[in-house]
Amino acid sequence: MKVSDRRKFEKANFDEFESALNNKNDLVHCPSITLFESIPTEVRSFYEDEKSGLIKVVKFRTGAMDRKRSFEKVVISVMVGKNVKKFLTFVEDEPDFQGGPIPSKYLVPKKINLMVYTLFQVHTLKFNRKDYDTLSLFYLNRGYYNELSFRVLERCHEIASARPNDSSTMRTFTDFVSGAPIVRSLQKSTIRKYGYNLAAYT
């Protein structure tokens, strides 16, 4: 961790250092989203040790079986002692179900007509911890996925546009008879916009 980042960490008055020191796992839960938005993160692989039950980070000498059943986490690495490194991962505080539901401060319409609700029925989906981890991974690295999606789409457009003697067309409302070319000439800004929209599916 850089000196500037360490100062941000200490200035925010987080108690994650103490938690990391007292935790035997290499992976330590941290409920502060502010911390992960202000300090650079990295993706590391972890596994559960069968003998001790502890969560350990994958290292060079980690066995093949442990590597095979490892999982990735977005983390902040922290040195808590001489040659002792811990990894903080963002985990939301567990909701207090005993207190009952908390009224939303946002106005919710009685009937939602959005296609995403009526067609895909997303409001009926049930999420587990792995689903939340996946969404958290995307949220914390959305800039990377946005750029990756744009680069992939840009490359696909270049290859499709360079195909020789491609006369493939598609009927449209304006060109119903002869049809319009399937591969259109697009500006880089347009491809980038489409790529960003696809980021969640990469």
From Swiss-Prot:
<dbReference type="InterPro" id="IPR050978">
    <property type="entry name" value="Y'_ATP-dependent_helicase"/>
</dbReference>
<protein>
    <recommendedName>
        <fullName>Putative uncharacterized protein YLR462W</fullName>
    </recommendedName>
</protein>
<dbReference type="Pfam" id="PF11603">
    <property type="entry name" value="Sir1"/>
</dbReference>
<dbReference type="InterPro" id="IPR021646">
    <property type="entry name" value="Sir1_ORC-binding"/>
</dbReference>
<comment type="similarity">
    <text>Belongs to the helicase family. Yeast subtelomeric Y' repeat subfamily.</text>
</comment>
